[in-house]
């Protein structure tokens, strides 16, 4: 039945192992999470959301799991998978943004980081998703009671202003 199929392939794991997608590179691990489960004409189906590590492409991910997403007990549909958005640390864009961060905050300890989240920046060319996050602070991102301190928001505005100046100079 579908529940057995789902539990064998997805279950409570978010690492993609059940569909042959367990993969990690130096920037992070692939994540695979349940999307929408629905019943239509007596058939249960679900979608999955996959966030792809930097060194994989969407087509490779589809090929890796194609034969493991359907059997007599169910079918899992893969929604749109976007190729990762990535710029190396040496990129002029990354350098301009990081310099703005350091100049405003004085923080030279924390470096630019790569995350696996989705972003509208993927819709444009030569764009980087960029935002404030203090390491060690739990902002409850995408959860109940998500927040940012007013002082950190004010600092972020100054970083964004400096970042715009730096980007205009490229």
Task: Name these PLM-found stretches.
Residues 42-58:
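C-terminal catalytic subdomain
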């Amino acid at each position: 039945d579908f529940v057995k199929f789902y539990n064998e392939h997805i279950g409570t794991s978010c690492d993609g192992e059940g569909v042959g997608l367990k993969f990690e590179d130096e920037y992070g691990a692939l994540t695979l999470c349940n999307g929408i489960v629905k019943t239509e004409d007596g058939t249960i189906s679900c979608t999955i959301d996959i966030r792809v590590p930097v060194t994989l492409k969407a087509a490779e991910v589809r090929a890796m799991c194609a034969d493991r997403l359907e059997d007599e007990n169910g079918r899992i549909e893969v929604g749109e998978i976007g190729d990762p958005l990535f710029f190396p640390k040496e990129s002029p864009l990354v350098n301009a943004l990081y310099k703005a961060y350091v100049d405003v905050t004085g923080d030279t300890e924390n470096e630019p980081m790569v995350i696996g989240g989705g972003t509208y920046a993927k819709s444009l060319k030569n764009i980087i998703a960029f935002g404030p996050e203090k390491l060690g602070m739990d902002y409850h991102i995408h959860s109940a009671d998500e927040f940012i301190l007013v002082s950190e928001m004010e600092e972020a505005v100054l970083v964004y202003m400096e970042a715009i100046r730096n980007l205009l100079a490229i």
